Amino acid sequence: MRIERRFTKPGQSSYAEIEFRKAVSEIKNPDGSVVFRLADIDVPAQFSQVATDVLAQKYFRKAGVPKLLKKVEENDVPSFLWRSVADEKALKELPEAERYGSETDARQVFDRLAGTWAYWGWKGKYFSTEEDASAFKDELAYMLATQRVAPNSPQWFNTGLHWAYGIDGPGQGHFYVDPFTGKLTKSKSAYEHPQPHACFIQSVEDDLVNEGGIMDLWVREARLFKYGSGTGSNFSYLRGEGEKLSGGGKSSGLMSFLKIGDRAAGAIKSGGTTRRAAKMVVVDADHPDIEAYIDWKVNEEQKVAALVTGSKIVAKHLKAIMKACVNCEADNGDCFDPAKNPALKREIRAAKKDMVPENYVKRVIQFAEQGYKDIQFKTYDTDWDSEAYLTVSGQNSNNSVSLKDDFLRAVENDGNWNLTARKDGKVMKTLKARDLWEKISHAAWASADPGLHFNTTMNDWHTSPAEGPIRASNPCSEYMFLDDTACNLASLNLLQFKDAKTKRIDIADYEHAVRLWTVVLEVSVMMAQFPSRQIAERSYEYRTLGLGYANIGGLLMSSGIPYDSDEGRAIAGALTAIMTGVSYATSAEMAGELGPFPSFAPNRDNMLRVIRNHRRAAHGQSEGYEGLSVNPVALIHADCTDQDLVAHATAAWDKALELGEKHGYRNAQTTVIAPTGTIGLVMDCDTTGIEPDFALVKFKKLAGGGYFKIINRAVPESLRSLGYSESQIAEIEAYAVGHGNLNQAPAINPSTLKAKGFTDEKIEAVNAALKSAFDIKFVFNQWTLGADFLKGTLKVSDEQLSDMSFNLLDHLGFAKKDIEAANVHVCGAMTLEGAPFLKNEHLAVFDCANPCGKIGKRYLSVESHIRMMAAAQPFISGAISKTINMPNDATVEDCGAAYMLSWKLALKANALYRDGSKLSQPLNASLVEDEDDEDFVEELIQQPLAQQAVTITEKIVERVIERVSREREKLPNRRQGYTQKATVGGHKVYLRTGEFGDGRIGEIFIDMHKEGAAFRAMMNNFAIAISLGLQYGVPLEEYVEAFTFTKFEPAGMVQGNDAIKNATSILDYVFRELAVSYLGRHDLAHVDTSDFSNTALGKGIQEGKTNLLSTGWTRGYKPTLVSSNEGDRAASEPKGSATAAPARGSANVTSFAGSAARKLEPTVAITTSEIVSFKRDYEERAKELAEEIAEEVIDEVVQEAQQTATALFSDKAAADAASAKAEAKKKENERRMRSIAQGYTGNMCSECQNFTMVRNGTCEKCDTCGATSGCS
């Protein structure tokens, strides 16, 4: 073959026109600890810090690279392609520690790859002359260095280590077909023949232990996972549950073996590999176990939810039971007898109500009886890497169902569907096709699995059906071919082929790159070794390739073309058509020199039929396709604004067909669209694969650590192409990214701050900190301004300073809307919606996969993703790896509709991801807002005052399922309660309660005296309605359930309440407060004031004998012992009248039984702040409680309790540990939500622990360290 030079010149270095720079690569954990560091490395100047980090961390060889090398002469190889080995003699002159080391120059990596490909290409007779080989090597090195193209990760890891450095090792059980003899050979060297393939499809037979069977598959998968590759298999040959075995028994079924494979993959992943095992499981829709398979992940997610919730409920009750036993002072084992220990009896009842197993309750009591003081019961969370997810199955694979057209047509026609036995084809079960379709849609909605393979469409485009059908794919579903074959990937960065002057794709450069990289991937098949003999043989016979592209989203946005537009789809289709057409033409050209792939002859007619169908689609034909069940979406020439692309697309397919008819093809497949996760970062791609962009503001990594905000580089270029002036572009960018200072900000600026007492020095300090801030609230704090200034000038108290939720701007009197307006000005909106000068008709150009920023509303529709895939699919040999993002409020029906549209538009596969469908993913706040409650309040205000009480009562009555009619219960004329003052979203709220004689709540008053008359009247009538309901027996729990989490203004931060720190409305705040105080609902508090820890102070057997009281007025006070010299306490004295030093945040409180009918002797009156919710049985227990409360405690108990209290409170280790854990969790959640606002998924990277994960095909990748679960 003749190789043209387009980027380099003969006799000149590949890098002559490329500037390089010194760099330091460092990746840190969020806590600042260094994960990886490599200093003084050389990289191309255009490489970003992220690209530098990925190259240095993942692709530089870290050890075994000799400092001094020598060439190994080969007579039949040009000298510039001679391989190198360590110069042992020269190395002996160096200190031993300096003889071997790491690659430190990007040129070492580029030369290692390009040189190895040229070396094997020469040996395989791919080049006509030495100059062609030299041009091939130089052009490839140049394209790697300029980020035009990148191969998949295994090429970077393995290729060239033997050729460039002489690195070698014993064989690892791999095989290869000798390219010169055609004989299958077992590898003796680990590196001479590298493993460059990322994607594998493996067969599995219905055999337990023999080669090619079930257990053998786990071994073959393990070998692939160990080296970072992914694999997929169709398990439909395995018999269903209950099918007969040859030995006379019955099969345990498909699912039992899938769970074994899942465990094996998970163990390998956790055994030290750099990323999760990438695995695809496929099952045909007519398999007898298909229903269980579809529900597999749904059920496992439910198990996780049960583990997480159940573990916390059980732990709570078991600790309470243990505490009731330990804090008891009775004799003769009475503490462990619920009949004699009322506190224990109460806790057992509460545990039984929450379904805690009785044998575990008994076990804890026995444990306490043996002298133990505390119990450890492990709780779980929904983190992806937590033990809860590790405990359940099905978490280590992507699951897909393979559907044929007859099933989909049965769904359309509401027909029946048969599930058939694997051996004899007997019908095992018949069900409605729509029922199975509903199950698939629900599972995708609930757990993001399964994806779908449209099997008929896959096989209609199959180039080699003589050997059998396509049954499976790799984990990301872009490579679809015969079982036991492999594919190595490479992707072109489309944006790098855009001409800076013409603003169009340089088609000649693009076609040149496609041609050369088709040769690279073909040579890679020749030089490769494979993990099994079957894959080695079949890969040699079919020689499938995986050339693709990335950055179509970035290209379209930078060109001012919406992703969701006919023009955008036409350009994507034309570029895809050129790529595959030129690649097949190159394959035919190689076949003319070296012969077609060995299995071409029996598949000639089918392959040429497929090529003709590709050509018809490129020519824009809507009819005349051969052997297709569903016609593709043809290229619409008129929609493409660059007609040169159309001309080259049609010419490429004309040539591909012409040369193929003449020579055949060297490769059965040549192209796919892969996720391009890690390699996309190396190429600094804005978008991966065929994906749109995910954010308009990016966070660029700095060499010394940290990030700074920059506008997506496609935005200014797009605005220029749309005709905006430079000054307008600057304003639009500043709106998105922020101005970085308060100088011209609305409401909060130097003038208004000076009026509040700020000096020029303090304003300058604020402006300096704002340059890198994500939110202005994070800058107005004691670390920026100094504690002395805050306390002295701004009158901030020590308590406020220590409050993590304290908002200084709120304290200074700035309104929420003013803070938000200033925040947008300073830190940016992170969206272009609302930007100055930007026309509404241009907003679509900047639509992303998700809403951008806090105020962004626009995002690409589900249909836009599917139609973009459909525009490219007719020009791809394989398929497209892509996951369709769906909003959280998408329905099961929406999922089914998306899948049905995918089939009708002739896609080969698709997968869905509904936001929040995984427990491990936090919900995006913007997706869970509910305006219904705000609408309800607005409608309420419009009503007459008399009607308002009726409406509110009706809302409550809807919540009460059944209640026995009863008379109104009157409150005492002189009644107890408490007053709680707080500020909610800047508005003062006074909540007062009135209690029945036994401590139950009977009325509330809500006073917001500075609000308008209408709002005050509404709140007053609301409180009356609630009070009437309470007096007529409506349980407080029903009000709590109805009104917590309601959302309307005023809302926001809560100050002055020790348990509640944030509320979504006044009603939310009021009923959270009442729930915590009267129901013990500490799950509704933000600061847990309960006392379940082992340092909490109780009163033994008296624990359950004190009258039920509100804890609203006692919350936050230290335990107080009433000494005997304080005298008797009158029954009429109000609760809480004892002097107690306030200690905000303390979990232990004191309450007094002050309403007894007679005076009590001085007692230890120490109880927990927990109040048991008696719900509807409190009347039955009133007499029992009245009798219990009259019992006395002797003086010895007073002294002993005083000693116990002193001892318990002297050790704060447990409390400190709990506080630290809570604070760490709070910070993690803050970082998680901040990452969501920045456009990331909110999940944490398992390698570097940063919250910088973005969706990448069916998986995710980390923008910080490049970790990915995909194949690239």
Swiss-Prot record:
<feature type="binding site">
    <location>
        <position position="230"/>
    </location>
    <ligand>
        <name>substrate</name>
    </ligand>
</feature>
<dbReference type="Pfam" id="PF12637">
    <property type="entry name" value="TSCPD"/>
</dbReference>
<keyword id="KW-0846">Cobalamin</keyword>
<feature type="disulfide bond" description="Redox-active">
    <location>
        <begin position="199"/>
        <end position="487"/>
    </location>
</feature>
<protein>
    <recommendedName>
        <fullName>Vitamin B12-dependent ribonucleotide reductase</fullName>
        <ecNumber>1.17.4.1</ecNumber>
    </recommendedName>
</protein>
<dbReference type="GO" id="GO:0000166">
    <property type="term" value="F:nucleotide binding"/>
</dbReference>
<dbReference type="GO" id="GO:0004748">
    <property type="term" value="F:ribonucleoside-diphosphate reductase activity, thioredoxin disulfide as acceptor"/>
</dbReference>
<dbReference type="InterPro" id="IPR029072">
    <property type="entry name" value="YebC-like"/>
</dbReference>
<dbReference type="Pfam" id="PF08471">
    <property type="entry name" value="Ribonuc_red_2_N"/>
</dbReference>
<feature type="binding site">
    <location>
        <position position="153"/>
    </location>
    <ligand>
        <name>substrate</name>
    </ligand>
</feature>
<feature type="active site" description="Cysteine radical intermediate">
    <location>
        <position position="476"/>
    </location>
</feature>
<feature type="active site" description="Proton acceptor">
    <location>
        <position position="478"/>
    </location>
</feature>
<keyword id="KW-0547">Nucleotide-binding</keyword>
<dbReference type="InterPro" id="IPR000788">
    <property type="entry name" value="RNR_lg_C"/>
</dbReference>
<keyword id="KW-0237">DNA synthesis</keyword>
<feature type="active site" description="Proton acceptor">
    <location>
        <position position="474"/>
    </location>
</feature>
<feature type="region of interest" description="Disordered">
    <location>
        <begin position="1120"/>
        <end position="1147"/>
    </location>
</feature>
<dbReference type="GO" id="GO:0050897">
    <property type="term" value="F:cobalt ion binding"/>
</dbReference>
<dbReference type="InterPro" id="IPR050862">
    <property type="entry name" value="RdRp_reductase_class-2"/>
</dbReference>
<dbReference type="GO" id="GO:0031419">
    <property type="term" value="F:cobalamin binding"/>
</dbReference>
<dbReference type="InterPro" id="IPR013344">
    <property type="entry name" value="RNR_NrdJ/NrdZ"/>
</dbReference>
<feature type="binding site">
    <location>
        <begin position="675"/>
        <end position="679"/>
    </location>
    <ligand>
        <name>substrate</name>
    </ligand>
</feature>
<dbReference type="InterPro" id="IPR024434">
    <property type="entry name" value="TSCPD_dom"/>
</dbReference>
<dbReference type="GO" id="GO:0071897">
    <property type="term" value="P:DNA biosynthetic process"/>
</dbReference>
<dbReference type="Pfam" id="PF02867">
    <property type="entry name" value="Ribonuc_red_lgC"/>
</dbReference>
<keyword id="KW-0560">Oxidoreductase</keyword>
<keyword id="KW-1015">Disulfide bond</keyword>
<dbReference type="InterPro" id="IPR013678">
    <property type="entry name" value="RNR_2_N"/>
</dbReference>
<comment type="function">
    <text>Catalyzes the reduction of ribonucleotides to deoxyribonucleotides. May function to provide a pool of deoxyribonucleotide precursors for DNA repair during oxygen limitation and/or for immediate growth after restoration of oxygen.</text>
</comment>
<feature type="binding site">
    <location>
        <begin position="474"/>
        <end position="478"/>
    </location>
    <ligand>
        <name>substrate</name>
    </ligand>
</feature>
<comment type="similarity">
    <text>Belongs to the ribonucleoside diphosphate reductase class-2 family.</text>
</comment>
<keyword id="KW-0170">Cobalt</keyword>
<feature type="binding site">
    <location>
        <begin position="198"/>
        <end position="199"/>
    </location>
    <ligand>
        <name>substrate</name>
    </ligand>
</feature>
